[in-house]
Design a protein with these regions (language model features):
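Preference for intrinsically disordered or flexible, low-complexity segments
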Residues: 1-264
């Protein structure tokens, strides 16, 4: 890089690199015979025996002429389970737990765009430390979306800001062009699904962290509807971003993370 046409700005670009834990999914597994407790996208979760599949309560407006609010219940849809021991050291902040399993659920039917807290009402982030007695859960509603189980390899990766060139006073067109070429080399082609823990988010619309300096990306789950993937699509080729405050991360309060959906 230092010998390239952005040599004068190489140090600034290097300083802008953020480590990330890449969730590199493999081909969807037949059935759901992945090892109990293994990291995966889609399929069904392996929950501690004492934990039930999360069910949300929500209010729905019904009636053709005389509208009324009806409280309904329905299960959340399983997205991912990440075995914390699989996450490489140095790819995530030190406050991220090194034991247990992090689970992610979301209402894939109603697909809310903005969830204030992932506490089980529209989405859920759940970290379980005691995972010695796991059982493969049974989906409570066969009519809900079913996503193919994909084993996940968790690897150290790197990210760069996608919106702004991290170089002061760099209005050089050559530098900008090189940076655009560099981004997919560092963090993968733009059109490939990007699932990851931490690092710089690959925003589709505006930066949801721009006015929230105390927050960071926790988990990014991309649309992945190819035949080898879990088969989900968020809006028009969108992405789910789970965002968490540093204080909540340090205290393990994952249910206080918020969720943003962006799409094209």
């Amino acid at each position: 890089m230092r010998a390239s046409r952005v040599a004068d700005h190489a140090d600034a670009i290097i300083d802008a690199l953020e480590p990330s834990a890449v969730l590199a999914r493999r081909r969807a597994a037949p059935g759901d015979d992945l090892p109990l407790g293994s990291s995966r996208l889609g399929g069904t979760p392996d929950l501690p025996r004492a934990i039930q599949w999360p069910v949300q309560r929500f209010t729905e407006r019904v009636g053709l002429f005389k509208k009324r609010d009806v409280v309904r219940e329905g299960p959340l849809d399983f997205l991912a389970q990440i075995r914390c021991e699989d996450v490489p050291k140095g790819s995530v902040p030190g406050a991220f737990p090194d034991h247990g399993i992090l689970y992610a659920f979301y209402d894939a039917v109603r697909a809310p765009w903005d969830v204030a807290a992932c506490d089980g009402r529209e989405a859920l982030l759940l970290h379980c430390v005691d995972v010695d007695d796991l059982v493969r859960a049974t989906p409570p509603d066969p009519d809900r979306p079913s996503f193919a189980p994909c084993p996940v390899d968790v690897a150290l990766g790197w990210t760069l800001p996608t919106d702004d060139l991290p170089v002061p006073d760099a209005d050089d067109e050559a530098c900008e062009a090189y940076y655009e070429e560099l981004l997919p080399v560092i963090q993968g082609p733009e059109n490939d699904p990007s699932h990851r823990l931490f690092g710089e988010a690959r925003w589709i619309q505006s930066d949801a962290l721009e006015d929230r300096p105390s927050e960071r990306l926790l988990l990014q789950i991309d649309s992945d509807s190819g035949q080898d993937g879990p088969g989900w699509m968020w809006g028009d080729a969108g992405t789910l971003y789970f965002l968490i405050r540093d204080a909540d991360l340090g205290a393990g309060r994952f249910s206080l993370a918020r969720l943003v959906l962006q799409c094209y």
